[in-house]
Design a protein with these regions (language model features):
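A short, basic-hydrophobic beta/loop patch
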Residues: 1-54
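Conserved aromatic-histidine-acidic binding/catalytic patches
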Residues: 2-7, 185-193, 253
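Enrichment for repetitive, rod-forming helical segments
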Residues: 17-18, 115, 265
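Charge-dense, extended regions
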Residues: 234-295
Length: 295
């Protein structure tokens, strides 16, 4: 129990082919039995999952690069079936289910949000590899100081979604909103159970930590507790309206939505800002921020 064997199989298959060639006579006998050569094996004890990931990245130089998403999915694949966050159900792509209920999230989306937290970038899935940017490794080193950053990230985000759901548990009535197309979502859960909001949240939390505004996920939980409930319903309507307007201007709709949610959470969770704890005000200011950054 507790042992992880990391093998990309490239070298293993190469060694197997060399041995088979030797045994079949394809390799001259004078070259010697390849199994007589030494094979280097490294064993690490007392190391956490992110420490393993860090070594996978730094020791993988020169090999075919994995995507950032693949790197982290390898380490956190066990969360698909053994999530430790109460009230959360992680859905894998092969399940074919759509997250609809409170606590249901696509595992892929949570991974993207967590990666945004690590890299302090809501566009993380466009990156080929964490090694492309040394700063990403520095951020990775910072989060390893926490006991279980994946659980902490997911628990904080789920806490936020629960706060939104408890403040407004109904369905938005958008008939009089004159939207240009179908609404982004009609419920609090529907708005915040997608990758766009999770990556925005991850990026915002990481940025606020870098600025020294928050120190840990306990501070994030505290900030969420202070969100004014009477601002939630109007805030959800405003988010849907802003995302509808954004859709007509966006060059890359998904990326622009991520930018909007990043700005939203930066405003909402910043205790030093005027919009702190006010969902409606944060949603409005986030749209203004979006316009300034994209025009």
């Amino acid at each position: 129990d507790g042992i992880k064997i990391l093998d990309g199989l490239q070298r293993s298959y190469t060694i197997r082919d060399v041995v088979l060639d030797y045994e079949s006579g394809k390799v001259p006998a004078e070259d010697g039995n390849p199994l007589n050569n030494l094979v280097r094996v490294e064993i690490y004890t007392g190391i956490n999952k992110l420490g393993i990931l860090y070594r996978m990245l730094t020791l993988n130089t020169g090999q075919t690069r994995m995507t950032t998403r693949h790197q982290i999915e390898i380490i956190y694949s066990d969360y698909k079936t053994n999530c430790q966050v109460p009230g959360v159900n992680l859905i894998s792509e092969v399940d074919g289910n759509i997250p609809r209920k409170l606590g249901d999230y696509h595992f892929r989306d949570v991974i993207e949000g967590f990666t945004s937290y690590i890299q302090e970038d809501f566009l993380t899935m466009d990156r080929l590899d964490i090694l492309d940017n040394v700063k990403d490794l520095e951020r990775l080193a910072k989060v390893t100081k926490e006991d279980n950053p994946f659980d902490d990230f997911l628990a904080a985000y789920h806490h936020f979604v629960c706060k939104m759901k408890s403040s407004f548990g109904g369905e938005l009535n958008v008939e009089d909103m004159k939207l240009s197309s179908n609404p982004y979502a009609l419920t609090a859960v529907g708005i915040f159970n997608k990758s766009q909001s999770m990556t925005g949240f991850g990026n915002a939390v990481s940025s606020l930590k870098s600025l020294g505004v928050i120190g840990s996920f306990k501070d994030v939980d505290s900030a969420i507790d202070e969100i004014s409930e009477h601002t939630v319903e109007d805030g959800l309507y405003r988010i849907v309206s802003c995302l509808d307007s954004l859709r007509e201007m966006a060059k890359k709709i998904g990326n622009d939505q991520r930018l909007y949610f990043y700005r939203f959470f930066r405003r909402l969770l910043d205790k030093e800002g005027a919009e702190f704890g006010n969902v409606d005000a944060a949603a409005e200011k986030a749209y203004n921020d979006y316009l300034r950054e994209t025009r």
